[in-house]
Regions:
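Phosphate/dinucleotide-binding and metal-coordinating scaffold of catalytic cores
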Residues: 1-203
Length: 203
């Protein structure tokens, strides 16, 4: 994967601004002129809407801004992405923040997109959930596992946040998030989460 030098931040096909890295590997961001005239601040405390270049601090987001860090996979998504990269001969540790945002591209769950879009996920229909659940167990049980499940989970939306294995799938023209058990979850974790969701609706 060729290193990315600059990222365009997009919101509903509008250019919000551009990201680059300083020589100290700190994120530098600048709003586009058009966005300054008719847009809004995407991070009021860190990135108020005005002209000029903003330079991130080294902490707490490893030289990035929180609004972009939120767009990156964590937990399960990060595990799958890094395993996927390794299987394709790419050392995840060599990737910059810009490289990782390009891998999110247009497939993140938030409103922001990133170009160039180097994402490798794709919309797919209903699948064999039982087989995917077994693959998730194999992946979580071994740091060296290199089966087809790595590609399958990455293609089916490896970037959502959270610790548990999950995929996005389409069924009857609707998008669904399907979650699987983590290593130490009880067998009825799905039923428990469903009950909690019903309680949340009542609140």
């Amino acid at each position: 994967m060729n290193s990315i030098n600059q990222i365009e931040v997009i919101y509903h096909n509008r250019l919000v601004g551009r990201l680059a890295l300083t020589k100290d590997n700190l994120c530098a961001f600048e709003y586009s002129a058009e966005w300054q005239n008719s847009g809004f601040s995407i991070s009021p405390f860190e990135l108020p809407l005005r002209s000029g270049v903003f330079i991130a601090k080294s902490r707490p987001f490893d030289g990035g801004f929180g609004v972009f860090d939120d767009c990156l996979p964590d937990g399960w998504g990060l595990l799958i992405l890094d395993r996927y990269l390794q299987q394709n001969g790419i050392n995840p540790r060599t990737l910059s923040l810009l490289d990782r945002l390009a891998l999110v591209g247009s497939t993140g769950r938030g409103a922001l997109e990133f170009r160039p879009d180097k994402s490798v996920t794709s919309e797919q229909d209903y699948s064999d959930f039982e087989e995917l659940a077994l693959e998730a167990e194999r992946i979580l049980s071994s740091e060296d596992y290199a089966g087809k499940g790595i590609d399958e989970f990455q293609y089916r939306g490896g970037s959502p946040g959270g610790a548990r294995p999950k995929i996005f799938t389409r069924h009857e023209n609707k998008e669904w998030l399907v979650k699987f058990r983590a290593k130490h979850d009880p067998k009825n974790i799905g039923a428990l989460e469903y009950e909690y969701s019903l309680l949340a609706k009542k609140c």
